[in-house]
Curated annotation (Swiss-Prot):
Superkingdom of origin organism: Eukaryota
Record CDD domains: bHLH_AtIBH1_like
Primary location recorded for the protein, binned into one broad class: nucleus
PROSITE patterns per UniProt: BHLH
Protein name (record): Transcription factor bHLH150
């Protein structure tokens, strides 16, 4: 990456070339594994040990596997190199996370089909709060009716926090929420480890500071 910066080329737009042949995506991933995979595995191992001290109730096991974190980290590293300047790290990280989930859940499919990740997060962060405030102001009737209304409002708030689950039945909503939380925890661990590795290998690059 340092040689590309010295030549004045943009690593996010120019393809990686070896001789006269463009290096395919699979080979770039393999090269990335050889460069920093050992350090990545060690960092992920340490983060996984520390995370195991916290309760793991209702968390999806697939996101706790070191292999999933390794695959996500390598895909994220390659995506950040190829991303446009207008794309934020958060948007790229969320899209790679949804791609890693392979569209097996509602939240991952919602992120993949969303054209505006920022507006999606804005709706996810602001509307639940306004809905909760309206529920508090408009609660009335008998005690049992107020209790049922409060439960329904909380379910709607929870559905607004998870992408693609605004109108999902409660049992499926709980499963989606558990999987989404586990995926976000894995994302934090992987991005933290990747940021440390990039800062050690290339302390002067903008990619490490952006994470």
């Amino acid at each position: 990456m340092s040689s590309e910066q010295g030549n004045g080329s943009n690593p996010s737009t120019s393809p990686e070339v070896e001789g006269t042949k463009t290096i395919p995506f699979r080979r770039r991933l393999q090269r990335g594994q050889r460069v920093f995979a050992p350090k990545l595995m060690e960092a992920l191992r340490r983060s996984r040990v520390s995370s195991e001290e916290a309760p793991v109730r209702h968390l999806s096991r697939r996101w706790r596997a070191t292999t999933a974190q390794k695959v996500y980290s390598l895909k994220l590293y390659d995506a950040l190199q190829r991303s446009r300047r207008s794309a934020t790290v958060r948007d790229t990280a969320d899209k790679v996370l949804a791609t890693t989930a392979r569209g097996a859940t509602r939240w991952s499919r919602a992120i993949l089909v969303s054209r505006f990740g920022t507006s999606l997060r804005r709706r996810r962060n602001t509307k639940p709060a306004s809905a909760l405030a309206a529920a508090i102001r408009g609660s009335g009737g008998s005690g049992r009716r107020r209790k049922l209304s409060a439960v329904g409002n909380r379910v709607r708030v929870l559905g607004g926090l998870v992408p693609g689950c605004r109108r999902t039945a409660l049992p499926e909503l709980l499963d989606e929420t558990a999987d989404y939380i586990a995926a976000l925890e894995m994302q934090v661990r992987a991005m933290t480890a990747l940021s440390k590795i990039l800062s050690e290998l290339q302390p002067s690059t903008n990619l490490g500071s952006a994470l």
